[in-house]
């Protein structure tokens, strides 16, 4: 959002394209090619995310103890299966695509964050209840997690630096 706000300030500026070219380096994010994405949950959405990440040049690890035959058949052959601990330890980015059940409640907690690679980014577009909010705030504030992105805003998360909350737009 900082980049969007910055561009809005440029309205009417002379030499706009030169200003944009010069200033855009302030907003450069991660180069994802060659980085490792961990996909937790390989249902229809998880498979699509994993396959897209392969297409973007990422190394992809997938974890799903309930992977269906259909899911496996649609999964790119470059996606490697992993156990959860190895995925947490290895992935630069982790995206979660599992349902909320009693066994997935707070699956991301202080113990889980301790197993994760330092500086990892966690993306949760599944359910808010999968993540212990106090633990994720602590992990982000300590630098253990570089960033947490979710579409389940909670009061405890809104306004915390390096936590991005957007509205849930699930179909």
Task: Identify what each model region corresponds to.
Residues 35, 42-43:
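Glycine-rich Rossmann-fold phosphate-binding loop(s) that bind the pyrophosphate
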Residues 1-36:
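Phosphate-binding beta-alpha-beta segment of Rossmann-like dinucleotide-binding domains, i.e.
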Residues 52-53, 116:
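Aromatic pocket-lining residues of Rossmann-like dinucleotide-binding sites
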Residues 40, 63:
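The conserved SAM/SAH-binding core of class I Rossmann-like methyltransferase domains
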Residues 55-59:
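Residues at the starts of beta-strands that form the adenosine-phosphate
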Residues 46-47:
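N-terminal Rossmann-fold NAD(P) dinucleotide-binding loop
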Residues 158-171:
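Adenosine-phosphate binding glycine-rich loop
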Residues 65-156:
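Rossmann-like adenosine-cofactor binding region
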